[in-house]
């Protein structure tokens, strides 16, 4: 019988509130979600038994927390990481770095094959009857543990960091899809697996719908104040896909995960992602994890000798299934790095809980077995990040240059190429020259690459769009707009185009393309010289100009400026946070994702950039 008293909810919320405070007070370096499960053990069946398990409030909020956790798991998948392995890189030891996607794919295939073999071992030993479910449990990897650990160690953008991240991303995607297949095969509506295609088709339609409307001006204007249309759209998407997945006989968490993947593909702004994280990890998800601990009865588990024997064996299987495939990296990395990577990839939590819960609901495994699997996941998530930090020795990475490509060599672009600092940028200039201009080109001080034409096929075959920044500045405005839109469609992160007409300007801005023109630049410069000559002096001063730094180091998240360890003559001029522009003062707190406008000597600014961008 369901209870509607809020007393149990109050207990759970107080515990969820106190958990991170206690972790901080006692300086315990374990994931907060693991600590929440442990606190649930203390107040639940295994401990003080303060929570009524059948409480309606808790059941509803816990289920919503589970759904939102799966949504955020999908949202955590950074699809741009699949593109980061194309450029040739060199490791600190001088070896050429492996292609991150290829290496991650090989490692995951190894993990999956080994997990399958180990699963059959558990079946033959009589611990479990379903090898499919056990394969998913052994092969899964927790993005929720991997991503914060990589960020904390500031190796997210390194070659090894990207490989670890990609393995976790591929494992997350593959496990979730296979979990949906498992649910369809062993559920009440088994044999209707083709219905899942309807869910994925709906996801594709919703993705293109979102892509069309994302940059519309009315959407931008409705994303502020009390409307927050972006947040409303995301919650609507979650509920629609959850309802659709349930109506098709699939698990509701598949719909939530798909919603997260779709939002991630649409590249939401960081401010919106932070809002969703704050809501999820600040309210619903802690309730879910505390309730996971509340429902676990470890004393009953420990009375089962089979479970007691299986727990250490499963922990060993988790380690073996990750460390052996990671040995593939031995030709590039030392043993400490390989073992550290294997330990971090062993961390597993949310999808194990999902798999165990679904397995129990489908009567594939018992309640005790479900509890044992969750307990193993908790233990693994406690010690594996600690082992990673102990084993991994961070080597200084060579400063990675940004690549910038100019299409069009003219009086605007060529002087800029000489002024960009060589230690920060690899510059490439391409241009279509007339035959009678070849001699002048050979005598020029500028390094310009001659191409036959600006056709789409030509530009793509030359790898023009595989650059960090693309500046399109040919003499033809229509061509500039066309190439800029193509580049954005091909995935170029930053595109700058030279256009002057209002029609082109509006269309390009909707796609997130920066624009410039001689007329606009001249008007802006003249107005600045008239109204604020001091600002123009600051902008054009080579020694102390304005610089943008992206705040990406979680170590300084929440630090107030007066306590920030500034060096030299660096001054914070402005902070851009989402759509807000903040005038900084001593009590201003830095936040992840901030774009900082600073001024000062180049050397000190470079040091600050290394500190905050890692």
Curated annotation (Swiss-Prot):
Q: Where in the cell is it found?
A: Cell membrane
Q: Which SUPFAM superfamilies match?
A: NAD(P)-binding Rossmann-fold domains (SSF51735), TrkA C-terminal domain-like (SSF116726)
Q: Which residues form a coiled coil?
A: none
InterPro entries xrefs: Cation/H_exchanger_TM, Na+/solute_symporter_sf, NAD(P)-bd_dom_sf, RCK_C, RCK_C_sf, RCK_N
Q: What is its main location?
A: membrane
Activity modulation: Binds cyclic di-AMP (c-di-AMP), which may regulate the transporter activity.
Q: Name one GO cellular component term.
A: plasma membrane
Q: Which GO terms describe its molecular function?
A: antiporter activity; monoatomic cation transmembrane transporter activity
Give the matching Pfam families.
Na_H_Exchanger, TrkA_C, TrkA_N
The protein here is known as Putative Na(+)/H(+) antiporter YjbQ
Species, as recorded = Bacillus subtilis (strain 168)
């Amino acid at each position: 019988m369901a209870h509607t008293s809020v007393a149990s909810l109050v207990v759970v919320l107080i515990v969820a509130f106190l958990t991170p405070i206690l972790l901080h007070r006692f300086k315990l370096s374990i994931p907060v979600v693991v600590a929440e499960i442990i606190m649930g053990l203390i107040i639940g069946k295994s401990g003080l038994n303060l929570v009524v398990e059948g409480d309606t409030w808790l059941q509803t909020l816990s289920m919503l927390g589970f759904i939102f956790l799966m949504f955020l798991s999908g949202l955590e998948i950074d699809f741009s990481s699949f593109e980061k392995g194309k450029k040739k890189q060199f490791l600190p030891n001088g070896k050429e770095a492996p292609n991150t996607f290829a290496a991650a794919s090989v490692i995951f295939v190894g993990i999956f094959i080994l997990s399958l073999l180990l699963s059959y071992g558990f079946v033959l030993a009589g611990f479990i009857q379903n090898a499919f479910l056990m394969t998913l449990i052994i092969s899964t990897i927790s993005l929720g543990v991997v991503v914060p650990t990589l960020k904390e160690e500031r190796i997210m953008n390194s070659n090894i960091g990207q490989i670890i991240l990609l393995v976790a991303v591929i494992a997350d995607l593959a496990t979730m899809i296979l979990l949906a297949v498992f649910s369809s095969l062993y559920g009440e509506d088994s044999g209707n697996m083709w219905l899942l295609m309807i869910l994925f088709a709906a996801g594709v339609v919703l993705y293109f719908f979102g892509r069309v409307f994302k940059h519309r001006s009315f959407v931008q204007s409705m994303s502020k104040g009390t409307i927050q249309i972006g947040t409303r759209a995301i919650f609507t998407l979650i509920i629609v896909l959850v309802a659709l997945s349930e109506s098709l006989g699939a698990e509701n968490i598949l719909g939530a995960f798909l919603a997260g993947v779709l939002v991630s593909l649409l590249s939401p702004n960081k401010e919106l992602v932070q809002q969703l994280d704050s809501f999820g990890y600040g309210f619903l998800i802690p309730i879910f994890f505390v309730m996971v601990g509340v429902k676990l009865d470890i004393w009953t588990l420990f009375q089962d000798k089979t479970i007691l024997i299986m727990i250490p064996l499963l922990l060993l299987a988790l380690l073996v299934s990750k460390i052996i495939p990671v040995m593939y990296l031995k030709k590039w990395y030392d043993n400490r790095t390989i073992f550290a990577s294997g330990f971090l990839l062993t961390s597993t939590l949310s999808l194990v809980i999902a798999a165990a819960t679904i397995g129990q609901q489908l009567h594939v495994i018992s309640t005790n077995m479900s509890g044992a699997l969750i307990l193993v996941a908790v233990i693994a998530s406690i010690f594996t990040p600690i082992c990673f930090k102990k084993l991994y020795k961070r080597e200084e990475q060579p400063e990675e240059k940004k690549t910038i490509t100019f299409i069009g060599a003219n009086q605007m672009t060529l002087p800029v190429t000489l002024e960009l600092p060589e230690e920060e940028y690899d510059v490439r200039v391409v241009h279509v020259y007339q035959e009678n201009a070849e001699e002048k080109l050979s005598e020029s001080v500028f390094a310009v690459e001659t191409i036959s034409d600006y056709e789409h096929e030509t530009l793509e075959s030359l790898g023009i769009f595989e650059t960090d920044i693309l500046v399109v500045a040919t003499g033809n405005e229509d061509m500039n707009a066309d190439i800029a839109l193509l580049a954005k469609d091909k995935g170029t992160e930053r595109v700058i185009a030279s256009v002057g007409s209002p029609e082109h300007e509006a269309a390009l801005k909707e796609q997130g393309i920066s624009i410039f023109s001689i007329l606009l630049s001249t008007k802006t410069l003249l107005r600045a010289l008239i109204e604020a000559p001091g600002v123009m002096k600051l902008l054009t001063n080579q020694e102390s100009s304005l610089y943008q730094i992206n705040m990406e180091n979680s170590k300084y998240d929440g630090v107030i400026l007066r306590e920030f360890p500034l060096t030299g003559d660096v001054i914070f001029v402005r902070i851009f946070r989402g759509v807000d522009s903040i005038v900084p003062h001593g009590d201003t707190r830095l936040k992840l994702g901030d774009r900082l406008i600073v001024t000062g000597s180049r050397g000190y600014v470079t040091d600050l950039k290394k500190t905050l961008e890692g």
